[in-house]
Amino acid sequence: RDDDDWTLEKFKAALEITPHDFAFAYDKLNPKGDVEKVAAEAIKSASRTSKLTAAPVIPIVHLPRLKEGGYDSAMAGPVMRQVSQALQPPLLAIPERELGFGVFERTRTMAAIRAALKGLGRYQAVHVLGAGNPIILALLSAAGADSFDGLEWCRYAFDGEHAHLHHFQLFELFKYQAALAESPVAASAAADPDVSYTTKAVMHNLDFYHNSLGKLRSALKDEKEFVAFLTELLPKGAMVQARAALPGVL
């Protein structure tokens, strides 16, 4: 939450009029202090939210900002463990941007989180907020992330053949892919002249995600299959870099 207009009262009103099975905590950004204080802030936010809904609440962990920029991602594992121990939530969330600067650092942080969550006596699922790039989804999944949300599906146009993201106005270059969509709804939208450009692009993107995530789930069940999946997904030659940077993951 980084909007002064988004108050607890408005959050409560939204919960009251919106059917929901889960609710993310009304979180507080930029916590300060050590592991215990940062974890306590996330626990407090989740506990406060639980008073507003009967649905299970998903805590959101935020990390302290560093003076030189970025976040104290080394704190992520210990903080996530403390929050998990205190609340035992169905999901425990953390923003992708707070995992580190680059894709490899973020993946290593996710692996450290998964390692920190071992030995709890139960499996703690981890949700990564703001993650939607196909490459980061694959790498974070390999490192132990379970679910994601992001806005790439409505901000970009996907080249489904190569799993690349392009500016939204370039969707016309991939209309031939939209016409071959596996989803009958997406295929119908692509063929209907009365459907808007934006809707056609979004439906194409969602069809891509549906297919791509299905392949990712299948690949994660077998190490060799995942290596082949990731090699095809990454830029040419990048798999060598990825393996060198992520020895505990790949």
Tell what function each PLM region has:
Residues 3, 34-38, 72, 102-109, ...:
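Residue-level preference for long, well-ordered alpha-helices that form the structural scaffold
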Residues 36, 70, 102-107, 139-142, ...:
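Generic detector of ordered, mature protein regions
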Residues 35-38, 43, 57, 61, ...:
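Extended aliphatic helical segments
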Residues 52-190:
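Glycine-rich phosphate/ribose-binding loops and adjacent secondary-structure elements
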Residues 12, 44-47, 81, 111-118, ...:
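Surface-exposed alpha-helical segments enriched in charged/polar residues
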